[in-house]
């Protein structure tokens, strides 16, 4: 009798229809914002992720190539996207907008689910560090969620640079800044 591997499953027609619906809606949003739709390779060099995401090493799904190289199934889309963009578009001042909907392969544990792969979508904007660009990315994230029927949402920003700029603009006292940072740290522990 064949042994079933935990967390691997057949994706049936109804779920495929849902994937197609989500992909179509999200790609439509990305195209409205001027993104080029891309697909990164399914297999990537292990060392690339070991360097940039050492915290993912245990969650990555690894294999050995026929040449003996350690490869990983795509655990993330941003790293290969940025590597490829820097190689194919060497003019760093050029505005580049990319969008993707891809299966990502790594172990994950959510509040009610776990598995070894999931559908991930996103947009990457390179070459524009303005607040307006940050705002557009946040609008695009909200439009992604709305396009698939999610109306009740909260978007959290995790960028230290963004938060530092916001705090500077708010001109908080040291005590106020300390209290806000404490609240933010506690929020991340919940």
Name what the model sees in each region.
Residues 1-79, 83-190:
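Extended, charged alpha-beta segments that form solvent-exposed binding/catalytic grooves
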């Amino acid at each position: 009798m064949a042994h079933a591997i935990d967390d691997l499953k057949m994706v049936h027609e109804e779920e495929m229809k849902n994937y197609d619906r989500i992909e179509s809606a999200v790609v439509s949003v990305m195209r409205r914002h001027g993104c080029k739709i891309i697909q990164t390779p399914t297999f990537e060099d292990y060392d690339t992720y070991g360097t940039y995401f050492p915290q993912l090493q245990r969650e990555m799904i690894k294999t050995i190539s026929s040449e003996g190289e350690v490869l990983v199934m795509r655990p993330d889309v941003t790293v290969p996207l940025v590597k490829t963009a820097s190689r194919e578009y060497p003019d760093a001042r050029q505005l580049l907008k990319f969008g993707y909907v891809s299966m990502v392969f790594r172990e994950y544990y959510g509040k009610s689910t776990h598995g070894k792969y999931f559908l991930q979508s996103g947009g990457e904007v390179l070459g524009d560090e303005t607040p307006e660009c940050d705002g557009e990315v946040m609008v695009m994230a909200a439009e992604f969620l709305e396009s698939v029927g999610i109306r009740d949402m909260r978007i959290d920003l995790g960028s230290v640079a963004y938060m530092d700029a916001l705090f500077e603009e708010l001109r908080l006292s040291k005590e106020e800044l300390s209290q806000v940072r404490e609240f933010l740290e506690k929020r991340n522990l919940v």
